[in-house]
């Protein structure tokens, strides 16, 4: 048994869904990162919703894996800020023009791979099954995984023909 926290559950659930819309529609990297991390925090809260030891452990695992990806995302924003690039359209227009752009695209791809629960980050997704059924279905079937895949696809012009692109292709 656990205490009734349905209001928090649905508020977090809808924040998660809203953040997914933000990821799809954001062009600015800082806004994209903002929505990206809302999905991380929301998934942590939703996986740990039941407040059992198992759900808390799996929520922390999901949080740590996704925060590693978020760190890569933040580092990419810093690198791209030095190059004067602050949105995905400008990043894609650069292609693989410089090592800095390719490195930043690689860090963003790392974030996408972590969010998509690709090897070696797949461990958190299995543990997410302790969450209530709508959450585990949402995390497994569509949103978190597809958010990572979506970001990697948007970066494909920057990774094409590079060693980083080959590494991403091998992993994902």
Range-by-range predicted roles:
Residues 1-172:
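...captures the hydrophobic TM-helix bundle architecture rather than a specific catalytic motif
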